[in-house]
């Protein structure tokens, strides 16, 4: 199962295993600070396949992060979204998942934990 792990840059996720479903064999993420970095570190330290989609600024300019987010969710069977309640990028992912009927689990967290 391909599990996208996305979230606000100011957040960190400890014990990602508590959120991942059984059978998760691949982590899909965007390579940014915060949640994406936690996802990368988890995948690498647990021997999971890691697929990262980075924003293509040369191709898409300012809309590159949003285009990247679409690519992430299109390559996932499930999306785990860790949101600080403010981040526009994570909010965009949540809305896109719902409008495309892509399974998404949302965890709203503060920057302090």
Language-model features, listed with the residues they occupy:
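Acidic/glycine-enriched connector segments
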Residues: 2-3, 7-111
